[in-house]
Amino acid sequence: MIPKIIHYCWFGRNPLPPLAQKCIASWRKYLPDYEIKEWNEDNFNVNIIPYTAEAYRQKKYAFVSDYARFWILHQFGGIYFDTDVEVIRPMDDIIAAGNFMGFEIDPDGENTPGRYAPRYCFSVALGLGFGMEASHPFLKKMLDIYAGMKFELPPEDISWYKTIVAYTTEALCKE
């Protein structure tokens, strides 16, 4: 069973913007029985692996969150949302069905370079939300993938740059 806790990451020590506050309010509205936990520099070791340490050093906090979300759910289980995700209805039916992941479909039926895994017109988009029990093997697999990666600053034109969306989709398609 997925624990009743919603996790989100907020690195960089800046205040939450109005959109994030609005989205978090929607989580409270539609998932009132859930604890909401913010992860930041005070409760997550940004130096846990070289990838996150370098991303944090370069102030690319979203990339720190990419690894952190896997680590957090592996340790504690629960649901992860990016701070721009608004919940618009109760999710009891989805959560009761077990582990879940958000996904996107290319509306044109074609891959958009850099956004989707090669050969697929859909992508797992974990920032949209995903829920898992602690210690799920897929979480460990993703932690291992990131542990072996070097963080490199994305080029100015990131249309081809590989992101968490592509890494996750490719890992699932290999299963």
List the predicted regions and their residue ranges:
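Glycosyltransferase-associated regions of secretory-pathway enzymes
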Residues: 1-65, 81-175
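Small-residue hinge/turn detector
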Residues: 66-78
